[in-house]
A protein has these predicted regions:
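Residues lining hydrophobic/aromatic ligand-binding pockets adjacent to catalytic sites
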Residues: 1-130
Length: 130
């Protein structure tokens, strides 16, 4: 085998999975693009805890364990991503304390898109809910 790159790609030499999660510092082009967008335009994703965003949303030194619990603050530091979906509300309605916990992790102008609970959106009772 002469080209070792594919074999090398099998081994993750990244940081320990438990390393703290930190935001990836945005480059100048990303900051400039965000500054040119209208403030009324909001971009975001359906979640903040996608592991493949290391080096894009999370710093290259970030671990991946705990993204669901600790990744929201880092996600909200990206100048383009000023909103995110709260999918878990579909499965079980979140409490006021949950919403307050999320809100405390982001800037004041950050927004959430909350998925309605399945009891509201489903026209039938699911087998797993009987």
């Amino acid at each position: 085998m002469t080209n070792m790159e594919p074999l090398d790609a099998l081994f993750d030499d990244g940081p320990p999975a438990e390393a703290p999660i930190a935001p990836q510092p945005p480059d100048g082009a990303l900051r400039d693009l965000a500054a040119r967008l209208p403030r009324t335009m909001r971009l975001g994703t359906s979640t903040w805890n996608f592991p493949g965003w290391r080096g894009i949303i999370w710093s290259r030194g970030s671990g991946l364990t705990g993204l669901a619990e600790n990744g929201l603050t880092a996600y909200s530091k990206n100048p383009l991503l000023r909103t995110v979906g709260l999918d878990r509300n579909f499965y079980r309605a979140l409490t006021t304390a949950h919403f307050a916990h999320y809100a405390a992790q982001v800037p004041e102008d950050f927004r959430f898109i909350v998925k309605a609970p399945r009891e509201v959106t489903d026209p039938y009772e699911r087998e797993d809910r009987k």
